[in-house]
């Protein structure tokens, strides 16, 4: 995104750098929020929708913004594309503060920002090709060039044979692919995805997220994903911003937030994604056998396997009875529930030492 006061609008064409499918890609947009506040007024009452927002989204990255309903996620996105303006603060896109720009300049700027939505927002009266071509028609792109661009985009999103189909003939996943193709039509450097997968089933969600990864990987576009599903963040994002009541309560790499959440809100979201702590029924069944049960958060650098070796050396029987370990941003991470059975006083002492060591290094909970 150009940082000049008068951003230019280039018309992409097949075969040019930055055109869809070109592995050299586009340079993504850097986004910086500085002390951003948004206040809505309802009569004499003030509603602080955003409060003291400070964050930086690196160019070419994928960031997930997560929070419960009313947290301020969608309001934040509307500040980025200028559909709403903050009460105070700065929003810099590649170093250019967009807050004071007149609407005429913001319209030009929006051609560099793609948007996909939960409900797809396709024109039912236009076929797939017509929907994808719509922003190009608004730009005044010549018909032949427009048709080439649409063909290229449909191939990129895996819908080469659907150009003449109408939205009512498509599945939810196919509709969202059309939405992504349309969002890419003007060759943006920034893509905003507002709850783009929340209306889709899990399998289709995975397919759409893989397509967004392809967009980021091959085109270099910065992607901001608004969601209330931590699994979406886990699957696609480089970093995560956790919002609550209009504030950023936590932010960091996905691995950092997953492995060591600092707030209750973040911890609750992480728990919904991992789902590897025994529920009440499972816990009762596990407690029917001898031994003590511990659920341990696995992360690198906690000395877990050394601690397990010490337990075994003390004659403690160690069984993994629940959970699993996965790879997250090239780090091992997960939760394991262990049954530790001591057969001597030394074994009981070793279990206490294990518990103490894990408390100092990670999260551990004894299931009683």
Curated annotation (Swiss-Prot):
One of its GO terms (molecular function) is ATP hydrolysis activity. It catalyses: L-methionine(out) + ATP + H2O = L-methionine(in) + ADP + phosphate + H(+); D-methionine(out) + ATP + H2O = D-methionine(in) + ADP + phosphate + H(+). It is a peripheral membrane protein. The keyword Transcription regulation does not apply. Gene3D superfamilies: 3.30.70.260, P-loop containing nucleotide triphosphate hydrolases. The keyword ATP-binding applies. Signal peptide: none annotated. Residues 15-27 have a biased composition (Low complexity). Keywords: Amino-acid transport, ATP-binding, Cell membrane, Membrane, Nucleotide-binding, Translocase, Transport. ATP binds at residues 67-74. One of its GO terms (cellular component) is plasma membrane. Its EC number is 7.4.2.11. It is found in: Cell membrane. It comes from the Bacteria. Residues 1-27 are annotated as: Disordered. Transmembrane segments: none annotated. Residues 1-14 have a biased composition (Polar residues). Residues 31-270 form the ABC transporter domain. It is an enzyme of class 7 (translocase). Belongs to the ABC transporter superfamily. Methionine importer (TC 3.A.1.24) family. Part of the ABC transporter complex MetNIQ involved in methionine import. Responsible for energy coupling to the transport system. The complex is composed of two ATP-binding proteins (MetN), two transmembrane proteins (MetI) and a solute-binding protein (MetQ). This is Methionine import ATP-binding protein MetN. The gene is metN.
């Amino acid at each position: 995104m150009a940082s000049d006061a008068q951003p230019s609008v280039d018309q992409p064409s097949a075969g040019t750098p930055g055109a869809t499918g070109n592995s050299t890609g586009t340079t993504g947009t850097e986004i910086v929020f500085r002390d951003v506040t948004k206040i809505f007024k309802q009569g004499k009452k003030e509603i602080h929708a955003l409060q003291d927002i400070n964050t930086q989204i690196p160019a070419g990255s994928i960031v997930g913004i997560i929070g419960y309903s009313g947290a301020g996620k969608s309001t934040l996105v509307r500040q980025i594309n200028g559909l709403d303006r903050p009460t105070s603060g700065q929003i810099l896109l590649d170093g250019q503060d967009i807050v004071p720009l007149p609407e005429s300049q913001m319209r030009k700027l929006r051609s560099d920002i793609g948007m996909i939505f939960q409900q797809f927002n396709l024109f039912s009266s236009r076929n797939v090709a017509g929907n994808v071509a719509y922003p190009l028609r608004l730009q005044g792109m010549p018909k032949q060039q427009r048709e080439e661009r649409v063909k290229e985009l449909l191939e990129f999103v895996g819908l080469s044979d659907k150009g003449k189909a109408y939205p009512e003939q498509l599945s939810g996943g196919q509709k969202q692919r059309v939405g992504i193709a349309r969002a890419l039509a003007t060759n943006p450097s920034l893509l905003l995805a507002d709850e783009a997968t929340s209306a889709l089933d899990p399998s289709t969600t995975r397919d759409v997220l893989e397509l967004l990864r392809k967009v980021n990987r091959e085109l270099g576009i910065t992607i901001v994903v608004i969601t209330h599903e931590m699994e979406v963040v886990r699957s696609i994002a480089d970093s995560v911003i956790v919002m609550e009541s209009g504030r950023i309560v936590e932010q960091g790499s996905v691995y950092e937030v997953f492995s060591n959440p600092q707030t209750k809100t973040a911890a609750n979201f992480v728990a919904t994604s991992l789902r590897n702590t025994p529920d009440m029924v499972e816990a009762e069944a596990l407690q029917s056998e001898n031994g003590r049960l511990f659920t341990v958060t696995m992360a690198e650098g906690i000395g877990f396997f050394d601690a397990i070796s010490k337990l075994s050396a003390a004659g403690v029987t160690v069984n993994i009875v629940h959970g699993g370990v996965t790879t997250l941003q090239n780090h091992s991470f997960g939760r394991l529930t262990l049954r530790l059975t001591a057969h001597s006083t030394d074994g009981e002492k070793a279990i206490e030492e294990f518990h103490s060591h894990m408390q100092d290094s990670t999260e551990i909970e004894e299931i009683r």
